[in-house]
Each structure stands twice: as structure tokens, then as C-alpha cells.
Amino acid sequence: MAMEKTFDAAEAEARITKAWEEAGAFKAGANRSRDESFTIMIPPPNVTGALHVGHAFNNTLQDILTRWHRMRGFDTLWQPGQDHAGIATQMQVEKMLAATQQPSRRELGREEFLKKVWEWKGQYGGTIVEQLKRLGASCDWSRNAFTMAGAAGDPRTGHENSPNFHDAVIKVFVDMYNKGLIYRGKRLVNWDPHFETAISDLEVENIEVAGHMWHFKYPLAGGATYTYVEKDEDGNIVLEEERDYISIATTRPETMLGDGAVAVHPSDERYAPIVGKLCEIPVGPKEHRRQIPIITDEYPDKNFGSGAVKITGAHDFNDYAVAKRGGIPLYRLMDTRGQMRADGAPYAAEAGKAQDYARGRAFTENEIDVINLVPDHLRGLDRFEARAKVVDEITSEGLAVMTVASDPRLGTTALKPGAEGADAIVPLVEAKPIMQPFGDRSKVVIEPMLTDQWFVDAEKVVGPALDAVRDGTVKIIPESGEKTYYHWLENIEPWCISRQLWWGHQIPVWYGPNRDDLGASYKAFCAASEQDALLLAQNYYGANVEVDFDSGPEELSGGIAFGTIEGPGGQKTLQSVSLTRDPDVLDTWFSSGLWPIGTLGWPEDTDEMRRYFPTSVLITGFDILFFWVARMMMMQLAVVDQVPFHTVYLHQLVRDEKGKKMSKTTGNVIDPLEIVDEFGADALRFTNASMAAIGGVLKLSKERITGYRNFTTKLWNAIRFAEMNEVFTDAVPQLSAAELAPKAAVNRWIIGETARVREEVDAALDSYRFNDAANALYAFVWGKVCDWYVELSKPLLQGEDTEAQAETRATMRWVMDQCLVLLHPIMPFITEELWGLTAERAKMLVHADWPTYKAADLVDDAADREMNWVISVIENTRSARAQMRVPAGLYVPMIVTEIDDHGQAAWDRNEALIKRLARIDSLTKADAMPKGCISIAAPGAAFGLPLAEIIDIGAEKDRLEKAKGKLAKELGGLRGRLNNPKFVESAPDEVVEEARENLAAREEEEARLNEALARLAELG
């Protein structure tokens, strides 16, 4: 049956995917012929996710390695699965409930809401799995894992064979808690007021917005004054005045209510006279105005603003560090919704306590935490409403720093100098862009918040993770990733692992009263199950105390239930206890940090753990090097004392063709499924591979994808040519490279070229140079095979020499098969289709044996020299004709003035071929090159084309000079921009890079024009 003229990717991809699945082609260990294993863990996409270009790129690289190793006989496992994506999934389900007018999360309650989440996951959670299959991802889909598998309510939909991941997560938490590696404490976290939960740094988007910086005066206590002196760089006094205040600048005036100190740099001489003294916070009821100390710390920059910084340790990460160093109280101002706190005693009483602490009275963390320093009239207000009122109150009292109305720092509100009112005195409120943290899902401003959370004591587990990279046990590619890795881990902070959500692994801790301090504090019982927690509690409280479980509040607010009896002396004795479970869940990064062992069945002693762990390589983005990669390193080493993988390959973000980040806002998002629909999966995959330079910028363009779609067409046509020339008939034997032994130079040459490219591809993939592998295959298949071998073989295939015909068919059959085999890891669909169409095969291409032949055994030097000579003559002749714009179909004479024996022999054996492909009608020998010829270079020979009578030299020269003049203007403009430091420093990176690329392209064009003009000069 003859091949179709074109490849129908849409029809073939679905059919081939089904055939692979039915054959179990991707199962762990499929096609195994050796003991070595190759394991790769998919970075689990969110269960809420849909395929984007980042997924498509990342999974293409993983699939290339997986298919390559599987064809080489490795015991191969590509482990798929999905992350339960706590906050994202909870948000999606809450949206669904609202859209369908169902009861809200709060109305449903925790248990019923989680049922809804599992239902949603069963209905929509498999979307990205099907999308990855469309890409050709050869994961063992029968092993699809899920990071919440085995948790309460799991119906096992979509992850039927997943190991019990939940039990593994809980066991690790309990074990680490018992080893003192996990603790509950109060620290500053990123708080999302919309979702009312802590979030990770990765879930925070820092966006530049138009902001303001207010300048305020903090009066010195008791009306004290000091001499304020400013000096220039040479030490000359430029300002000297008496002041009774210290000025600060802030972008968040509402947080002034929680100030614990004002800090200045130890070397800042301006404030030396008042260090250690008290100043007054300029907000709140005057009669209860708080005073705070002026301290020194290395944090303030004396050259920025006034050099003095307010320290609000409970609402700023930098201030938190200063407060911790200086023993400054951390006053919490807001509730979980981002509103000013409304709890606690009246402001007057609370301010009095805080004043005592500022004057040196000792305090505990709990004593500080309950104090509410929000004035009564501001309590319950939204934080931004409170900001406006604080600014108004300070300004009304005359404690704002003032300036003239023409001060340019005022931004667009500044009046022009000399304008009416320009000299008026107004509050100094700088208009300036500021980086504002937003929740990536809620889109609300994130608040640094001091809350009780669970933490991993990262300092205790980071050492082995650092050592594993330092000693080479784990290699990070590119090497620049190692520096980033060291930076993060050498400066590691406690890792917040709790989230105030319902969807996730609920923290396995139950609380009861502290038997030694009833009603004042908790006793925590960490256990893998309720039964284990009960045993711990019974052992703690004793046999005389009845212990049961309370369903518990949805937020732990101190409502621990217990009963007592009073003894004869009035002492209280515990009689009953109801344990309450911690309502928080674990951060998804904690569970995904166990992805390698959790998916292989740990803590059970499984065959998979023995065969596939540690894994071979992890392919992931630079952006989660710390959040996921480093934490997997720490977790696996802490839990099983082994590294999770031997190599980490990091890649950049996939950007658009101009290097810009893709976003819906800018409208430059490329949907990979739309690309697959339009161009086929193979074109997208080859594009991904070709741009995967180690550490390189990833620019995806439809133009590039179109080019590789054309490559699939070229391959199809080459195989179709071979089929039409009876290459794949039963009469043509399927021989190995060693068995072919052809006589024709062209056949010996292409066998050697095939061996060379096999070695190039293996070397490239072995060192993760995916782009080099793709580019080598492209150059070989399109350039060597399609452009040259197919053309050079035509005289042999269509001639009357039956022996030459037979050897050429056998050679071409082998070469075409090798093209399919070598291309398969990158372009699996079209190669599998052609493999099946061209012959009866013992097995599918996905399980074909990867070749091991060597160039040293197959390269024929004589054939190489001859065919490379022939190709150079044809290529150089074609290039000269194109430059001189000789009509494509016109045959022209050629002159030769010298040629060595090798060249003459090559010409004699290939004359007809050279003349046909170079459009030469005759070859004439001459002692010297006649006037009007352009030279054609060839090894050991000097050829020329007499073109003076064929082209209009004058018109052609004018055309080229005109083009060169136009180009010179473009080059001048580009060079001017790139030589301008302001442009290079201030323009967006992608704009500068685009200008550099344009300059390089124009310079290449200039070189071509100069070459063409030089050739014209030869013609006279």
C-alpha cells in the first residue's frame, strides 16, 4: 500500500498513543535488557492545572531522555503524578460552589467540603494527564501518583495504583517532630488576607506599583533637643540646626501603631547624641502617646532618606530581624482578614503596658502577642482605611515633614517652580514606584504577619544537602545553579510548613491541657493516628483521667475542653480531657518534598524503591530550585539518608519570541495544545529540544515551530521517495551497517555520516545538550540525507546497473531506518508512523534497539573525501549563481584552470551528477581564467563561471550598492543605540537582546553584500 502524500498528525497521534498504551510500551521496565536503571520523576503539575508552554518544554526533555534510555535497554521508569495544590484547589472548589449556588465552604463544614473537593478532583483532575499524553509523554501512566493519595475520603479516582502518599507524609512529620526537627512557634510569614493563610515566597508576586512614601516627625521624649548636623562628602557642614524630633519615612503609615523602636546606623554621627533616648510615636490619643527607644543596628542605610528607620517587627521582614537582634517587642496590629485588630483591652490600658516594656520591663512573647496597640477609634477598620486616618491625624497635629509645593519628589502633584503657590509649604509625600507584594491567586496585597505556625528547623537538616552538592554526589546543571543553591541553603531560615486551609494533609497533632498549668497552656501529642494520639495522652494524663476526642474548632482558638474535680484542700485534679486536633494542613511543598520516595511506596520496603531509588535526573525550572529541589534534598537525606537524584538539570522560563515573559495581560501567551493542533506534537517537541541550550534563554516562536513542521514534511517526503523507489520491498534485505559493504562512494559516505551523527546524538544527550542533539539530527536528516544523499543516489537507483541499484536500496533502507530510530526520542509520532508503514517490524519503534555502531568502524576516508569534494563544488557553484542572480533553470558553462588528480577522478566519476545539480552545461579547460569569470573554490581545483554575458553587471552592482546604503543606515541606528549606556542599562532586557540580534543579522547581511560586490568586481 502506497504512502499518503502527507502526514495527518491529528489522526496519527491519537491512534499511535492508543497503540503504545495497549502495548504497555511505557510501563516500568518495558524493553529492559540490562541491569542499570534510569528513573526520572515528573515535577508533579497541580491537579488544577492545564498544560502550558513550560510544562510542554520540561516534559519534552524528560521524554527524550526516557525514550532514549528505554531504547538502550535500561530498566526505565518515568514516574507521573500530580500535586494536590492546596490553596489552588480549595480556591477552585469554592469558586465552583459559588457559581453553582451551593452552600459555601463555611456553611458546609470541613468534612462535607472535603467531599466536594474529592468529587471535583475526580471530575477535573485528569485534564493535564490527557494533555501530556497528547504531547507524547511516555510516563508509566498505570502508576499515576497523587500527593493526597490515601488521605481520608480518597475515592482513588485517577490515581488508582498510587502508593499511599498520605501515610508517608504523616510518618515523616511524626518522625521529624520526635527528632526535634519540627516545632511550632511564632514567626513572621507571608499572610494572604483573602484566603486567611500563610503562603510561600513563591506564591507572592512582587509588582511595581505607583506608591507613596510619607515623611513624619517622631518628637523626642520630654521635649529634648539635639544639634542635627549634615556634612558633605568632604566633611564640610552643609546643615546645622536644633531639632526636637527624628524623622522617618514609611510607605505603610498604619504600621506605625506597632513600632517598637527607631533604628539608625551605628556610624551615623547625625543621631549619635540621641541614641538610647526615647522618642514619641506621633499617632494615637495624645494622653496615651507611646514612647519607643532610638537604637543602633547595621540595617539602616544612612544615605537613604533620613537614615532613620521605624522598626515594626510584627509587620516587616527586615524589621523582624532587627527586632530579634535588639530584643524589641513585636506588636501585632491586624487580624487574619487584614483588618485592624478589635480584640483585647482598651487602648489606654494596652498602651500603658507597652510603655512599661519600652522603659525596660521584662516581657514574654505571649504577653506581647495579646497586646492590641490599635487606638479604639481605628479598631476593626480595613488596613488601608486605617492608613488614611493615621496620615490625616499626624498631618493635622503638625508632625508631617513639610516641603515646598514645587518639590519634584511630590511627583505629578508638584507645581512648576515659579507657578502660583509653588512656594507653599505642604506635607512631604513622595510619589515613587514601590514593589508591592500580591498573592498570586488572591491578587490582594500580602501582609507580613506574626502568627503561630509549624516550622522545619532547616538549619538542622541542611548540612547533608549542602555536602551532597559540594562533594559531587549530586551535580547541578548549569553550574551557575550551584551558586544559587549554596546561597539559599547557607542562609536558610526556618521553613514554615503549616497552612490555614482545609484541603491538604492535616497536621497530625492533637492538643490537650498542660497538666502542670491547667487552662494556661497546651500539651501537644504528635502521632500518626488518633489511636496513637490517644495512647500518648493516656500515658501522659494517667489511668485516672478519661481521654476522648473533640471534633474541634475549625481554627484553634484556645478552646481546649477538660474537666476537673476539687480536692479537700481546694486543689484541682484532672478528671477528663477532650483532645482537639490542629486544624491546619501541611504546605504542599512539604508533601511534594517527599515525591521521590513517596511515589515508590516508601515507607514500605518495595521492589520499586530498590530498583529506582535514588532517581537518575530531575529536570525542572530554576524558579523552584530552593522551594522544591533543595527541600527534596533535605527531606530525602533526613528520612532515608540518601540523595533523591544524581543530577539536577535546571532550565529558564519559556518566553515569547522577543524574550518577554508570557502573560494574559500582554496577550503573548502561546497555548501548546493549539500548537499541537496546528503543527503537530513533533514540531513542538523538536522546537523545544532545539532551544534547550544549557542555561540559555528560551524563546518560543511560531515561525520556529513552522520551520520544524516543515522538517517533518521533509522527512515524510524522503521516506516516501525511498518507498517509491522500492527501498522497503521484501526483495531488499534488512542488513546491519557491517553487512552492507557497498561499493559506491555515495553509499559508503552516507553510512559513515550516519555513524558520526549517532555518536554526536549520544554524546549530546549524555551531557544534557538537547539542542546539540536536535541540531545534529536536523543537519544530518535534512542536509546530508534529504538534500544530498537522496539526490546523489538517484542516478544509481534509476540507472541500469542492477548491482548498484541493489546496494543503494539496501543502504538507503538502513539509512532511513536509522533516521527514524535516532529521531524517535525527539519526534516520536511521525517516526513511529513511518516505522510501521514501511515494513513488517518485530516490534514498535518505541522499543527498537538503539544503535551502537562506531564512526571509527564505518567512516570510509576515500568516500568521504570524494563526496565532500563533489558537494563543495555543487554548493559553491549554487551559492555563486544565487549571489549573481543567475536564473535558476539556466545551464551555464564552467571553466577549470587547474585540478589535481583526486579532483579529476572525483569529477570523472560524478560529472553527470555535478552538471545536473549545479546547472552546468559544459566544462572547458583553460590556462588562465578569462575576463568576465567569477571564481568557484574547490579543494585542489580552480573553477570559474563566465557570467559577463549572462547578467547585467551594472544594474546588479547598482542594486547591491543601494541595498548596502539602506543597510548602513540601519546598522548606524542599531550601533548607536547599543553604544549608548543609558539604553543598555535602562531598556528592558528583551529589547536590548532584540537589538543585539538585529545587529548581528544585519552585519551578516552586510558581509553577504560585500562578498557579492567582490564577485561582481571579478567580472570587470
Curated annotation (Swiss-Prot):
'KMSKS' region (motif): residue ranges:
661-665
Q: Per its UniProt record, what Gene3D superfamilies does this chain match?
A: HUPs, Isoleucyl-tRNA Synthetase, Domain 1, Valyl-tRNA synthetase, C-terminal domain, Valyl/Leucyl/Isoleucyl-tRNA synthetase, editing domain
Provide this UniProt record's keywords sorted from A to Z: Aminoacyl-tRNA synthetase, ATP-binding, Coiled coil, Cytoplasm, Ligase, Nucleotide-binding, Protein biosynthesis
What is known about what this protein does?
A: Catalyzes the attachment of valine to tRNA(Val). As ValRS can inadvertently accommodate and process structurally similar amino acids such as threonine, to avoid such errors, it has a 'posttransfer' editing activity that hydrolyzes mischarged Thr-tRNA(Val) in a tRNA-dependent manner.
- What's its EC? 6.1.1.9
Gene Ontology molecular-function annotations: aminoacyl-tRNA deacylase activity; ATP binding; valine-tRNA ligase activity
Q: How does it assemble?
A: Monomer.
PANTHER family named among the record's database cross-references: VALINE--TRNA LIGASE, CHLOROPLASTIC_MITOCHONDRIAL 2 (PTHR11946:SF93), VALYL-TRNA SYNTHETASES (PTHR11946)
Which GO biological process annotations does it have?
A: valyl-tRNA aminoacylation
Provide the binding site for ATP: 664
Query: How is this protein named in the record?
Result: Valine--tRNA ligase
- Domain notes, please? ValRS has two distinct active sites: one for aminoacylation and one for editing. The misactivated threonine is translocated from the active site to the editing site.
Q: Name one GO cellular component term.
A: cytosol
Q: Which reaction does it catalyse?
A: tRNA(Val) + L-valine + ATP = L-valyl-tRNA(Val) + AMP + diphosphate
